[in-house]
C-alpha cells in the first residue's frame, strides 16, 4: 500500500510593454532610427506603413493544486497471479487578472477607422478536478507467460468564466479597477465554458518472460465521451463528442549477455482536437490576432518506433550504446495564418495537415586505453525533421 499526497501553490505578477511597427516593405532604417523619431511619416511614406502599436500589459494570477495517488497490490496465491489498484485525484483552483492598454493606428484605413484605443480589464477564474481508478489483473498461462487485463476510468471536469471589461479611453493600468471605475462588461468578448471528459480504457497485454528475452504485446481500447457547454456573445451551445481509440503496443527485449541488450518498441496513439477548436466561432479579443474554430478537424494519430542496443566488455573496459527513433504524425493539427494587408494582423484557423515525420539516431562509445587509467568517450547524434506547414503569397 502506497499513498502520495500532492500540494502546490504558485503566484504570478508580471508586466510587459510592446511598441511595434508593421510595414508593407523594408523601410530602409534601423530599429533605433524608427523608434527614435517623433514623426514616423518623416522617414517612411504612409503608403508603406500598415500599423503602429503601443501596448502595455499587467498580469496577476495565483494557482492552487491539491491531490494524491494511492497504490494497492495483492498477490493471489499462485506465483505471478496478482491484482493491483491505482487511484489518483487532483483539484486545481486558479484565477488571473489582466490589465491592458493598447493604441493601434491603421494607416491604410479610413480616417474614421484609423485610430483604435482598447483599454481592457479581463478576469478569468478557473476550477478543475479529475480522478482516475485503474484495476489490473495478471494471470499466468504457462511458464514465463502471462496475460494481463486492466481497466481504467478517468473523469475530468473544468469550468472557466472569462469576463472582459472595456475601460475608458483615458484609463491607465495604474488606475486599477474599483467601484468608481468598474468598466463596462463586453458581452461579445466575454465567454464561459464547462467541460466534462469521460474515458474508459481496456488493455489486454501478453507478457512472455524467458531467461534472455522479454516480450510485451497488447492492444488498448478507449471509448471516450466529451461535452462542452460554451457561451460567448449570442452563441450558447453544447457540443458532445464520442470517439473510439485503438492503440497497439509492442515491446521486445533480448539480452545477448549480462552486459549486452537489444530492445525494440512500437506504440501508436490517437489524440483528439481541442473541443473549443471544433466550435464554429471567431474570437477577436485581439484585433491583430483573430482566432477561428474549425468543426472539420480530424483526430491525430502518431506512430513511434524505437530501437536501442548496447554492450560493455568489462575485461577491456569498452562499450557502446545506440538509439534510433522514427515518428510520423497523421492528420497533425497546424495553425493556418492568413495575413490581412489592411490591418497587418492575422486570422488563425487550425487545420489538419500530413507529411510531418522525424528521425533521430545516436551512437556513443567508451574505449579504455591500454593502462585502463584513461578512457576515450565519443558521442554522435543525428536528427532529421520533415515539417509541413501552410505557406503561400498571403498565407503564413
List each language-model region with its residue ranges.
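Primarily recognizes Gram-negative and organellar outer-membrane beta-barrels
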Residues: 1-396
Amino acid at each position: 500500500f502506497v499513498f502520495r499526497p500532492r500540494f502546490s501553490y504558485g503566484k504570478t505578477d508580471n508586466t510587459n510593454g510592446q511598441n511595434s511597427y508593421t510595414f508593407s516593405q523594408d523601410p530602409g532604417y534601423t530599429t533605433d532610427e524608427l523608434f527614435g523619431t517623433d514623426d514616423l511619416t518623416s522617414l517612411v511614406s504612409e503608403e508603406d506603413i500598415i500599423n503602429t502599436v503601443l501596448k502595455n500589459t499587467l498580469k496577476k494570477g495565483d494557482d492552487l493544486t491539491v491531490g494524491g495517488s494511492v497504490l494497492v497490490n495483492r498477490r493471489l496465491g499462485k506465483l505471478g497471479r496478482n491484482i493491483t489498484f491505482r487511484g489518483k485525484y487532483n483539484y486545481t483552483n486558479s484565477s488571473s487578472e489582466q490589465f491592458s492598454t493598447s493604441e493601434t493606428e491603421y494607416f491604410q484605413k479610413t480616417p474614421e477607422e484609423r485610430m483604435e484605443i482598447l483599454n481592457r480589464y479581463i478576469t478569468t477564474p478557473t476550477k478543475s478536478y479529475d480522478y482516475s481508478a485503474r484495476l489490473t489483473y495478471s494471470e499466468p498461462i504457462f511458464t514465463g507467460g502471462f496475460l494481463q487485463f486492466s481497466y481504467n476510468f478517468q473523469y475530468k471536469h473544468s469550468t472557466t468564466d472569462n469576463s472582459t471589461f472595456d475601460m475608458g479611453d483615458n484609463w491607465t493600468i495604474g488606475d486599477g479597477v474599483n467601484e468608481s471605475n468598474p468598466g463596462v462588461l463586453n458581452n461579445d468578448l466575454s465567454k464561459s465554458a464547462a467541460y466534462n471528459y469521460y474515458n474508459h480504457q481496456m488493455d489486454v497485454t501478453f507478457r512472455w518472460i524467458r531467461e534472455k528475452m522479454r516480450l510485451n504485446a497488447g492492444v488498448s481500447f478507449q471509448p471516450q465521451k466529451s461535452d462542452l457547454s460554451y457561451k460567448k456573445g449570442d452563441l450558447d451551445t453544447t457540443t458532445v463528442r464520442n470517439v473510439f481509440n485503438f492503440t497497439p503496443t509492442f515491446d521486445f527485449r533480448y539480452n545477448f549477455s549480462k552486459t549486452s541488450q537489444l530492445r525494440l518498441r512500437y506504440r501508436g496513439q490517437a489524440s483528439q482536437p481541442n473541443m473549443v477548436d471544433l466550435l464554429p466561432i471567431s474570437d477577436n479579443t485581439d484585433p491583430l490576432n483573430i482566432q477561428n474554430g474549425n468543426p472539420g478537424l480530424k483526430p491525430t494519430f502518431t506512430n513511434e518506433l524505437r530501437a536501442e542496443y548496447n554492450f560493455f566488455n568489462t575485461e577491456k573496459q569498452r562499450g557502446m550504446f545506440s538509439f534510433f527513433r522514427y515518428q510520423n504524425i497523421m492528420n497533425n493539427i497546424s495553425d493556418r495564418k492568413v495575413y490581412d494587408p489592411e490591418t497587418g494582423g492575422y486570422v488563425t484557423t487550425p487545420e489538419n495537415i500530413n507529411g510531418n515525420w522525424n528521425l533521430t539516431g545516436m551512437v556513443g562509445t567508451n574505449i579504455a586505453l591500454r593502462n585502463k587509467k584513461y578512457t576515450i568517450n565519443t558521442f554522435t547524434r543525428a536528427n532529421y525533421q520533415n515539417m509541413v506547414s501552410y505557406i503561400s503569397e498571403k498565407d503564413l
